[in-house]
From Swiss-Prot:
GO terms for molecular function: catalytic activity, acting on RNA; pseudouridine synthase activity; RNA binding. It comes from Haemophilus influenzae (strain ATCC 51907 / DSM 11121 / KW20 / Rd). Transmembrane segments: none annotated. This is Uncharacterized RNA pseudouridine synthase HI_0042. Its EC number is 5.4.99.-. InterPro entries: PsdUridine_synth_cat_dom_sf (IPR020103), PsdUridine_synth_RluA-like (IPR006508), PsdUridine_synth_RluA-like_CS (IPR006224), PsdUridine_synth_RsuA/RluA (IPR006145), RluA_PseudoU_synthase (IPR050188). It is an enzyme of class 5 (isomerase). It catalyses: a uridine in RNA = a pseudouridine in RNA. Belongs to the pseudouridine synthase RluA family. Gene3D superfamilies: Pseudouridine synthase (3.30.2350.10). Keywords: Isomerase. Pfam families: PseudoU_synth_2 (PF00849).
Amino acid sequence: MEIEVVYQHSDFIIINKSEGISVHKDQEEQGLTELVAKQLNVPKVWLVHRLDKVTSGLLILALNAESAAEFSRLFSEHKIHKTYLALSNQKPKKKQGLIIGDMKKAREGAWKLCQTKDNPAITRFESVSCEPNLRLFILKPQTGKTHQLRVAMKSLGSPILGDGLYGKNTEKIDRTYLHATQLEFDYLNNFISVTCLPSQGQFWIKPTVFEQIQVYLTKPFLSK
């Protein structure tokens, strides 16, 4: 399987991870990193952050230990700005704003958003209607909690389209419609901005959806 390399630097690469590929610490993680290393003809690559198995889009892989340490610092200091796109067929309680609250483990591997704010997950978002019963969400996480965006969307009453863990009636949906579309950060005094549009999934390629994604890219939303 060929992994799409979206951006290449002497210290790191950014790939477009396909939906359905796990990067967590199981047997598949080693497979992903080994596959990329083999493709690049390098001894090893370092995973410096994660995407859920159901999420597609931009993923940074360091090419040396020093770069991995630098990215660890950047992520811990919240200096890497991430933007995600999501789709939902449910109307949200509010169309834009801030979703904030502590996250607590629920049943069957799921998480839930709490009213408390001791160590909260924070997400800025905006949304726009693509067509009846289909809405595009632009999500900007300010923290990096497990399942943060999926839980945030559920808390709005708009679970992500196709999300079998947090939504309902997902059997006929071909994927979970969450995509990491943009990364922006300073790396050793160089500003890096990478954008990757979603293409994997029947709803991403709908003209009404693609049009609204293009509008977002050319006309800044409040949270951008």
